[in-house]
C-alpha cells in the first residue's frame, strides 16, 4: 500500500475522549471550518453550531461542534429568487445528510493534520428538542451529529476494521458465505479483545429479560456488541420520526396533495 503523511494520518485516526488544557486558537478553528466548507456538494446543506464551554461539552472538550442539516438557509435563498421548495422532506434530508457528513469528515481530517483529535457523538438527532431550545434552531434544521475536538491527552490505538474483501466489491455485490463472514468476525473480535476495548470502557450493552447473560469482558467483543445494539435498540420508528418532525421534517410519505 502506498503512503504519505495524509494517508498515515487517516490510517492512524482514532476517537479521542481525553483532551489537554490547551485551547485551539481562533485561527485553528477557522481553518478547520473552512476545510469543512470545501466538502461536496454545491447546495451546501451543512452548517455548524460551536460550543467552547468545557463544563458543558462532552468529555470536557474545548470544542463541541453540532453539525446541522440546514435546509432553512437554502429555503431563505430560494425565496429571494421567488422559488418554493418542491423536493420532499425525505429527499432533501437525504441530500442534506450527505452534505453535512462530508463537511464533518473534512473537519476531522483537517483537525488531525493540525494535531487535534476528535470524537463523533451520534445521538444528536434524538436530542433535537433540547438542542433546538438551547440554540434557537429554526424549522427545517436537523442536528445530525456532534463532534468533540481538541488537543489529545491520550493516545489510544486505531480501532480494528473489516478485511478489505468484506468492504471493496468490484462490479457486483458478493454472496457472503459463512466462511467470509466468520473470517471478518474473527478479525474484528480479536482486534477489540487485543485492545481490551470494552473492559477499559467498562461497558456491555445490557440484555433484555428474554436473554441470559453468558459473556464476560474476557470474551465480549465487537460482534456481540453490535448484535446487542442493533438487535435491541430503536425498535419503534417514532423514536426517530418524532425528532425529525420536531425539526419540521415530515418523512411519513404524506404529500401536501394528500393532506
Feature annotation, model-predicted:
Residues 1-259:
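Acidic, surface-exposed loops and disordered segments
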Amino acid at each position: 500500500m502506498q503512503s504519505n503523511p495524509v494517508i498515515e494520518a487517516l490510517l492512524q485516526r482514532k476517537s479521542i475522549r481525553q483532551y489537554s488544557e490547551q485551547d485551539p486558537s481562533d485561527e485553528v478553528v477557522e481553518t478547520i471550518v473552512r476545510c469543512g466548507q470545501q466538502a461536496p456538494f454545491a447546495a451546501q446543506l451543512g452548517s455548524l453550531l460551536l460550543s467552547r464551554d468545557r463544563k458543558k461539552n462532552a468529555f470536557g472538550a474545548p470544542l463541541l461542534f453540532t453539525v446541522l442539516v440546514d435546509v432553512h438557509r437554502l429555503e431563505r435563498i430560494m425565496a429571494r429568487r421567488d422559488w418554493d421548495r418542491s423536493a420532499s422532506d425525505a429527499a432533501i434530508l437525504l441530500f442534506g445528510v450527505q452534505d453535512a457528513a462530508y463537511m464533518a469528515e473534512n473537519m476531522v481530517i483537517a483537525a488531525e493534520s493540525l494535531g487535534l483529535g476528535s470524537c463523533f457523538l451520534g445521538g444528536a438527532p434524538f436530542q433535537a428538542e433540547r438542542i433546538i431550545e438551547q440554540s434557537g434552531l429554526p424549522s427545517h434544521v436537523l442536528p445530525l451529529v456532534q463532534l468533540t475536538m481538541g488537543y489529545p491527552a491520550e493516545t489510544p490505538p486505531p480501532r480494528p476494521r473489516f478485511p478489505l474483501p468484506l468492504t471493496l466489491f468490484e462490479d457486483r455485490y458478493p454472496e457472503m458465505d459463512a466462511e467470509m463472514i466468520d473470517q471478518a468476525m474473527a478479525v474484528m473480535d480479536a482486534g477489540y479483545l487485543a485492545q481490551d476495548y470494552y473492559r477499559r470502557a467498562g461497558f456491555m450493552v445490557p440484555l433484555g429479560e428474554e436473554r441470559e447473560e453468558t459473556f464476560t469482558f474476557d470474551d465480549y467483543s465487537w460482534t456481540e456488541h453490535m448484535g446487542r445494539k442493533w438487535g435491541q435498540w430503536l425498535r419503534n420508528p417514532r423514536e426517530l420520526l418524532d425528532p425529525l418532525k420536531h425539526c419540521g421534517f415530515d418523512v411519513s410519505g404524506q404529500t401536501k396533495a394528500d393532506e
